[in-house]
């Protein structure tokens, strides 16, 4: 009896091992063969390029070592109707679908579109290609790929499915007519999986209240839960899901903290011009809204005498008055004094910018333009007064109010040279007179001594 049991046990276990070897033949020997080096690295890379199916791991121990999590649920297929050629191909590819005639005849473009969808990953990673209850789903070539680079494996899987689909279509003989509402219910499990995947996604109308012009309308055969999105809405939905916080106004993100520098305030001002009043009032507390004083906040949020207006007046009132009489301070040259005053005004403006609340970009540009105009006007007035003073010192141009600046400069140079020559002449005459005085004094002393 023991001998019979020993003989029957391997015989009973033989079909399991044979079936397992047949199912995982690609993972049994061919996948391990390139890892045996043949004394050269070139042979290893050459064998790896020649092999059509090459998973990155030699055995299941690598998969257990990395312990990769399953892929996240993907968005539903972009195909809007269930009666489309992609759905018919899916129904024929699905192991659970009922084979009711091969799914009809398709053109080359439809077949290429189905292959593109399969290679794109929208159908390879779903449950209608590999049954999750089956043991082969755990040992699938694509799931075994720990680096998710099984493009060749996906290509082979798609080619096998297409071959089986063409064989089924040849066996069916004549193509079946177009599917109606009854044909759409052949793969109810696929509908459940697709509706479950669609229910986990966010409706684009919730995230984006604005209507999408290129959104496709569902066909009559499609279920309400499996309505597909257009490429633009699908990309917007993926970006909204990946963002840390999704709000009805996507332009109003990251605006809760007030800026501290002038560059940050300018960026904040550009963002505040694009958002509406309601979003600003929700994000900013009442104290910040009253201090900001933005023109879009309404009349109640801006006090009649805000510190912003007072500081702007402070810049204009404390400027140097050149029409006032000169003070007792040290007099600098005209150009240097203009530079000092302009630097003082710019320093006051920069301090007021740091202390004031953020303003709009238009107000900032107006302030800069006004400051530049004030400084330029002061420079021109100072230069004009200097020329007028120089003209008044020249005897030839003293009464000529329309004398040009070039004439004033030339006459002033000639007058300075003549004055210097006259000065030298007067100095020489002074020396002669002093010597003459000394001689007369000496002669007077001699006369006094002789008369005594």
Swiss-Prot record:
Residues 348-360 have a biased composition (Polar residues). The gene is MYC. This is Myc proto-oncogene protein. SMART domains: HLH. It is found in: Nucleus, Nucleoplasm; Nucleus, Nucleolus; Nucleus; Cytoplasm. Transcription factor that binds DNA in a non-specific manner, yet also specifically recognizes the core sequence 5'-CAC[GA]TG-3'. Activates the transcription of growth-related genes. Binds to the VEGFA promoter, promoting VEGFA production and subsequent sprouting angiogenesis. Regulator of somatic reprogramming, controls self-renewal of embryonic stem cells. Functions with TAF6L to activate target gene expression through RNA polymerase II pause release. Residues 426-447 are annotated as: Leucine-zipper. Residues 264-276 have a biased composition (Acidic residues). A motif (9aaTAD) lies at residues 113-121. The keyword Nuclease does not apply. Efficient DNA binding requires dimerization with another bHLH protein. Binds DNA as a heterodimer with MAX. Interacts with TAF1C and SPAG9. Interacts with PARP10. Interacts with KDM5A and KDM5B. Interacts (when phosphorylated at Thr-71 and Ser-75) with FBXW7. Interacts with PIM2. Interacts with RIOX1. The heterodimer MYC:MAX interacts with ABI1; the interaction may enhance MYC:MAX transcriptional activity. Interacts with TRIM6. Interacts with NPM1; the binary complex is recruited to the promoter of MYC target genes and enhances their transcription. Residues 214-378 are annotated as: Disordered. It holds the Pfam family HLH. Residues 220-251 have a biased composition (Low complexity). The modification Phosphothreonine is found at residues 71, 328. One of its GO terms (biological process) is chromatin remodeling. It comes from Canis lupus familiaris. The modification Phosphoserine is found at residues 19, 75, 84, 94, 164, 172, 174, 306, 327, 342, 357, 360-361. Alternative translation initiation from an upstream, in-frame non-ATG (CTG) codon or a downstream ATG start site results in the production of 2 isoforms with distinct N-termini, shown in this entry as isoform 2 and isoform 1, respectively. Keywords: Acetylation, Activator, Chromosome, Cytoplasm, DNA-binding, Glycoprotein, Isopeptide bond, Nucleus, Phosphoprotein, Proto-oncogene, Transcription, Transcription regulation, Ubl conjugation. It comes from the Eukaryota. Glycans are attached at residue 71.
């Amino acid at each position: 009896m023991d001998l019979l049991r020993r003989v029957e046990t391997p015989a009973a276990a033989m079909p399991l091992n044979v079936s397992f070897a047949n199912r995982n033949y690609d993972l049994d020997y061919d996948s391990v063969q390139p890892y045996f080096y043949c004394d050269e690295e070139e042979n290893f890379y050459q064998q790896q390029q020649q092999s059509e199916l090459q998973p990155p791991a030699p055995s299941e121990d690598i998969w257990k070592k990395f312990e990769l999590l399953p892929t996240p649920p993907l968005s539903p297929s972009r195909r809007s109707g269930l009666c489309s050629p992609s759905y018919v191909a899916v129904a024929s590819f699905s192991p659970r679908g009922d084979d009711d005639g091969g799914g009809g005849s398709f053109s080359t473009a439809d077949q290429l579109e189905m292959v593109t969808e399969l290679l794109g990953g929208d159908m390879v990673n779903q449950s209608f290609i590999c049954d999750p209850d089956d043991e082969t789903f755990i040992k699938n070539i694509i799931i075994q790929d720990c680096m998710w680079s099984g493009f060749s494996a996906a290509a082979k899987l798609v080619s096998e499915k297409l071959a089986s689909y063409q064989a089924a279509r040849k066996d069916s003989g004549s193509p079946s007519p177009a599917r109606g509402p009854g044909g759409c219910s052949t793969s109810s499990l696929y509908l459940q999986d697709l509706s479950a995947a669609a229910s986990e996604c966010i409706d684009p109308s919730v995230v984006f209240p604005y209507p999408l012009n290129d959104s496709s309308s569902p066909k009559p055969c499609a279920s309400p839960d499996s309505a597909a999105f257009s490429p633009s809405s699908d990309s917007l939905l993926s970006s909204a899901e990946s963002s840390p916080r999704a709000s009805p106004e996507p332009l109003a993100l990251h605006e809760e903290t007030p800026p501290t520098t002038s560059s940050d305030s300018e960026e904040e001002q550009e963002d505040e011009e694009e958002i509406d009043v309601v979003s600003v009032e929700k994000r900013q507390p009442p104290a910040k809204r009253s201090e900001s004083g933005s023109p879009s906040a309404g009349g109640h949020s801006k006090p009649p005498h805000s510190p912003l207006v007072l500081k702007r007046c402070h810049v204009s009132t404390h400027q140097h008055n050149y029409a006032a009489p000169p003070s007792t301070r040290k007099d600098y040259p005209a150009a240097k004094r203009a530079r000092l005053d302009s630097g003082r005004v710019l320093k006051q403006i920069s301090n007021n910018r740091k202390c004031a609340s953020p303003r709009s970009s238009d107000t900032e540009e107006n302030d800069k333009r006004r400051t530049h105009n004030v400084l330029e006007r002061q420079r021109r007035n100072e230069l004009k007064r200097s020329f007028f003073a120089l003209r008044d010192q020249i005897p030839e141009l003293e009464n000529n109010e329309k004398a040009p600046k070039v004439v004033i400069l030339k006459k002033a140079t000639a007058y300075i040279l003549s004055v210097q020559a006259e000065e030298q002449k007067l100095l020489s005459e002074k020396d002669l007179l002093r010597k003459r005085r000394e001689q007369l004094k000496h002669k007077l002393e001699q006369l006094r001594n002789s008369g005594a």
